[in-house]
Amino acid sequence: MIKESTRAAVDALIARYSALEACRADLIKAVEVICASYRQGHKLLVCGNGGSAADAEHIVGELMKGFLLKRKIDDVMYAKMKKVCPAEADYLRDNLQGALPAISLVDEIGLNTAFANDQAPDLSFAQQVLGIGNAGDVLLGISTSGNSTNVIYAVQMAKVRDVKSIVLTGRSGGKLKPLADVAICVPDDETYRIQEYHLPVYHMLCIAVENEFFGPTEE
């Protein structure tokens, strides 16, 4: 279950991009899967290639700090800060923000290049899922074609590790669609137009999840 105000983020997205009505059920399911994972103390892993790699970085940036909300440090955390570092506690409280744990798998340049050189370039994301993916985590794989080999292997390894998978693709969904727990297949076939849908979709995911954990409580 998610808050009605969280679900409203999906409605707001579709109000602006009516073609995404076809994706409504999958958009809601993606929000629910990510929220369920965070509620249990797990994390989000994100991967993609080229422009989708940049999207992976963008998503992590929105989740690990405040996006639309202030995400104030709560009283329990502040009390721990005062105990550990009393002189700096106020500074930390006033400037740090609540975080939603997220890791971009495209970031690990040393690991990715070493693994590509020594083993198999198309398995670099899968290697990271093997290494840091834990049961209850979520993998978000982005591929406009739905056929990116390294993302496919990452999703397969996610299943091995009991990590839920969400994929963000174009209309066909490619080979990723049947592999993923949730497939958001935006309604276009041209790469740049698919990417133009992907950005508002993942912004919505970040807005919705942020609201679920840092937005106003509901009766």
Model-derived segments and their meaning:
Residues 41-42, 136, 162:
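Glycine-centered short loops/turns at secondary-structure junctions
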Residues 167-180:
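Short, glycine/polar-rich helix-capping loops at beta-to-alpha or helix-loop-helix junctions
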Residues 53-57, 122, 147-154, 176:
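Short glycine/serine/threonine-rich phosphate/pyrophosphate-binding segments
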Residues 1-21:
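Generic N-terminal amphipathic, Lys/Arg-enriched alpha-helix
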Residues 39-132:
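Glycine-rich, small/polar surface segments that engage phosphate groups of diverse ligands
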Residues 192-219:
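A charged, well-structured terminal subsegment
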Residues 21-40:
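A short, well-structured juxtamembrane/interface segment
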